[in-house]
């Protein structure tokens, strides 16, 4: 039978109703229920993976404050011409006011594959390692791009994060970086002739790319350092 409201009230000198759970038991029950839900959602085949993404994807987008921009991506005026096969430009999203510096290494006209290489300290970090990464990809016919993700390289900006609840009302640096990766991937996917887009995350940028790929549709491949 249902408890009477008066019997559920607890005042000084009055105990809990018989069988009432303690605060700790309530918390344990909620945790156990969520763990069971996650276990049931754990992917075991392609259909399970699709269901997992459908259920948990909105939560990830909400937690990061990031989304796939699609046709909302805008390309700003090139900050340089095509010099030695390299072009500098900036990307943004319509109505958002963001700016993502991007460097593009040209590929042969017949190229159908593109890769975004994301370093933790900005584009210059990739340039310093061209002999080991960018040039081999170019020789194999890849269109290669890299970005200065939020608060790295030329996109550095001072942020006062001393407020105790800063992340309640503002995106963290890493959340903004995930969005920048998504913006660049979306732009690459819309390049004429490009049929496959892959993603590489170096060092500390690996986790940014792992989070971004969960919100990016149909990437050909993802290689990301995940031990940071």
Features from the language model and the residues they span:
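Gly/Ala-rich beta-loop-alpha elbow adjacent to hydrolase catalytic centers
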Residues: 200-210
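Alpha/beta-hydrolase-fold catalytic nucleophile elbow
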Residues: 148, 200, 225-226
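Alpha/beta-hydrolase-fold serine-hydrolase catalytic core, especially in secreted/extracellular enzymes
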Residues: 1-113, 122-143, 150-153, 158-190, ...
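Active-site signature of alpha/beta-hydrolase-fold catalytic machinery across serine-
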Residues: 211-215
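Charged, long alpha-helical assembly modules
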Residues: 117-119
């Amino acid at each position: 039978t249902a408890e009477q409201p008066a019997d559920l009230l607890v005042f000084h000198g009055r105990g809990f109703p018989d069988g009432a759970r303690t605060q700790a038991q309530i918390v344990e029950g909620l945790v156990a229920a969520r763990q069971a839900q996650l276990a049931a959602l754990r992917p075991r085949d392609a259909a399970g993976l699709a269901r997992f993404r459908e259920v948990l994807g909105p939560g990830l987008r909400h937690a990061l404050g990031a989304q796939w921009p699609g046709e909302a991506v805008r390309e700003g005026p090139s900050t340089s011409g095509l010099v030695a096969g390299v072009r500098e430009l900036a990307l943004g999203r319509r109505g958002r006011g963001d700016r993502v510096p991007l460097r593009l290494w040209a590929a042969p006209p017949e190229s159908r594959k593109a890769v975004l290489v994301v370093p933790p300290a900005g584009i210059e970090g990739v340039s310093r390692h061209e002999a080991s990464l960018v040039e081999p990809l170019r020789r194999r016919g890849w269109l290669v791009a890299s970005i200065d993700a939020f608060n790295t390289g030329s996109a550095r900006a001072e942020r006062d994060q001393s407020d105790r609840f800063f992340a309640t009302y503002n995106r963290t640096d890493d959340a903004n970086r995930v969005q920048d990766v998504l913006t660049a991937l979306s732009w690459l996917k819309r390049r004429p002739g490009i049929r496959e887009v892959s993603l590489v995350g170096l060092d500390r940028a690996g986790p940014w790319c792992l989070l971004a790929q969960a919100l990016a549709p149909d990437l050909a491949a993802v290689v990301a350092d995940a031990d940071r």
